[in-house]
Regions:
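Conserved small/polar residues in nucleotide/adenosyl-binding loops
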Residues: 561-563
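SMC-family hinge/dimerization module
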Residues: 197-228, 238, 301-329
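ATPase nucleotide-binding head domains, primarily ABC-like/P-loop NTPase cores
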Residues: 294, 301-552
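Long, charged, glycine-rich C-terminal linkers/tails
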Residues: 180-197, 287-310, 374, 474
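Conserved amphipathic alpha-helical "coupling/scaffold" segments
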Residues: 1-157, 161, 266, 273-279, ...
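Short, positively charged
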Residues: 1-33, 203-216, 489-524
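Extended, charged alpha-helical coiled-coil/arm scaffolds that mediate oligomerization and mechanical coupling
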Residues: 79-82, 118-191, 220-282
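Phosphate-binding P-loop/Walker A region and its immediate neighborhood
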Residues: 261-320
């Protein structure tokens, strides 16, 4: 499956905080390759390719929930594979067991899938033609014990050497014990009687008797009261034993070299194991992120009928969950007749968060991640995502906020089209309200005419009116409790929002004469328009709250009925 990847600009990543999501995802990945892969993760816009990635994640989460699923632990075989390509190379003990454990896990996964009725076509495609094969496991077991010791049966030569070592040690122990008993009886030994150094048993002789003991002096205690002597009868036996240990070491190296050579013949299989482990590590990281964000898989299609239900801002949800604070989900819909949604309402009412919620979830989904929305949500795919969010000043180019935003707007208008998703916060701000509002109106018409989809936030009354008069656009507002003068952080599509400018001013105790003077300074039409929006939104909010309260009561009654 071919797919063209969109290169999301750094500004879009930063403004939508996609980089923070990727940082969380990177923290769950164990593979250095996957960490790098995550840092450069971009969005996909081939529905077939995207759905394949989402299928893999969904199937992985499904089978992973089974208690019999083989526990995944990342195994880095990169160095092993590089060594196996070098002639006469010898793997270390840890590297052999990395191959061993990888073989066990891959074969356990195959066994699990073969013996369960899970429908996992995407996972099976990921595994490819890897078949259950225990050769590598059994070959390593012929050499190593479960406790990582080299088996004596690994070769006839090693078996013989170890028998000789055992016999020689028995002789040595016998001679040493006899010698120690003899000198102990004569009273030549210190209370500790014996010591051990460099693999050799030594007599702990009181220094005053050192010349009476036959053997080779190996050292003295710090006080020089004890002299450590290797008994004469043991010297030749220790040399023979040391020689046998060297023979054992050489034979073990030969065995491991042969084993390495045997594994090299199966390099392709080991590479396939590692590729699968890398992919599962990536899936596991995405699965852990999904659990952290309480994320789901929405429906994805090439259709532009979009219905996003109960969408949370992923990062806000994580932060609020830590603090035990409720996060309010948002709903929004788009189709061919409603392509652009313009959100208005008071400051600190949640407009910007709502806009970022839809933008960030869109990026995450197209990057192959699950998102915190209701699973019955339907989403589409966009080739480009454009943003203009926040107070951006280009100090290097000496551009004011407004100049910068005009430059961004120019770029958006030049590059956007039917397959674009546009997100603009505080649309038209940064200049004189009357002039900025008029220019914003023209920009708005251009955005709508481009065929793009988008979410915009604004304070401008003329934009709210223009939206109402535009065929492919729709107003939306953030609900507000005008009694308590508190934002409800809930988006409602279908009506513009009031700024609640004078209501908030009264709430903070601003004198009424100042408020009335400010109202009198406004054009009569502006005051009437704002009052109309205010009263309409007030009724709408009251109705919304009443519906929610009724729903709670109904659910409570249903719960009681089932007790």
């Amino acid at each position: 499956m071919k797919n063209r990847r969109s290169n999301i600009s750094d500004s879009v990543r930063k403004e939508l905080e996609f980089d923070k999501v990727l940082s969380l995802l990177e923290g769950f990945a164990k593979s250095a390759t996957n960490k790098q892969r995550i840092c450069s993760l971009s969005i996909l816009h081939n529905p077939k390719v995207l759905n394949h990635y989402l299928d893999c994640l969904q199937e992985y989460q499904y089978i992973q929930s089974d208690t019999n699923f083989p526990r995944f632990e990342y195994i880095n075989l990169k160095e092993v594979i590089n060594y196996l390509k070098i002639e006469n190379a010898v793997l270390t003990e840890d590297q052999f067991f990395d191959v061993y454990n990888a073989s066990i896990w891959v074969n356990s996964l195959k066994h699990f899938l073969n013996n369960n009725d899970y429908d996992t076509p995407a996972i099976l495609q990921l595994i490819g033609d890897l078949k259950k094969n225990l050769y590598l496991k059994k070959r390593i077991e012929k050499v190593f014990t479960p406790r990582r010791f080299i088996r004596s049966q690994a070769s006839e030569i090693l078996f013989g050497i170890r028998q000789d070592i055992s016999n020689k040690r028995s002789q040595l122990d016998k001679h040493f014990q006899e010698t120690m008993s003899h000198y102990a009886h004569l009273g030549y030994l210190d209370d500790i009687r014996e010591s051990f150094a460099d693999g050799v048993h030594l007599l702990a002789v009181s220094s005053e008797y050192k010349r009476k003991v036959k053997g080779q002096v190996r050292g003295q205690s710090n006080t020089k009261s004890i002299t450590f002597i290797e008994p004469e009868k043991c010297i030749s036996l220790n040399r023979e034993l040391a020689h046998l240990y060297e023979e054992e070491k050489d034979e073990i190296r030969r065995i491991l070299k042969v084993l390495t050579s045997d594994l090299s013949a199966h390099l392709e299989k080991i590479e396939a194991y590692f590729n699968l482990i890398e992919e599962v590590d990536f899936l596991d990281a995405k699965s852990q992120l999904a659990k952290l964000m309480q994320a789901n898989r929405p429906k994805v299609s090439s259709s532009r009928a979009i219905s996003i239900k109960k969408a949370f801002h992923p990062l806000l949800l994580i932060e609020n969950n830590k603090k035990g604070i409720e996060t309010i989900p948002q709903d929004i819909y788009f189709d061919d007749k409603h392509r652009v949604v313009v959100i208005s309402g008071p400051n600190a009412g949640g407009k910007s968060i709502a806009l970022k919620t839809f933008g960030l979830n869109q990026l995450m989904l197209q990057a192959g991640l699950f998102i915190p929305v209701h699973p019955n949500s339907s989403m589409s795919i966009f080739h480009d995502v454009f943003t203009d969010i926040g107070d951006n000043q280009s100090i290097a180019n000496e551009l004011s906020t407004y100049s910068y935003r005009l430059t961004r707007m120019k770029e958006i208008l030049l590059k956007s089209g039917k397959s674009s998703f546009i997100l603009i916060d505080e649309f038209g701000s940064g200049s004189d309200p009357s002039l900025g509002g008029e220019l914003a109106g023209v920009f708005f018409e251009e955005i709508v005419n481009s065929g793009a989809y988008g979410v915009l936030t604004t304070h401008y009354g003329n934009i709210k009116v223009l939206v109402d008069q535009t065929k492919f656009a729709e107003n939306a507002c953030m609900l507000f409790d005008d009694t308590q003068l508190n934002p409800l952080y809930k988006l409602k599509v279908g009506q513009p929002g009031s700024s609640y400018t004078f209501e908030v001013a009264r709430n903070v105790g601003l004198p009424e004469d100042i408020i009335e003077k400010a109202r009198a300074g406004l054009k009569h039409g502006t005051v009437r328009f704002e009052d109309t929006i205010y009263h309409y939104q007030r009724l709408s909010t009251e109705l919304q709250l009443a519906q929610e309260e009724l729903s709670k009561q109904v659910l409570t009654e249903i719960g009681r009925a089932h007790v």
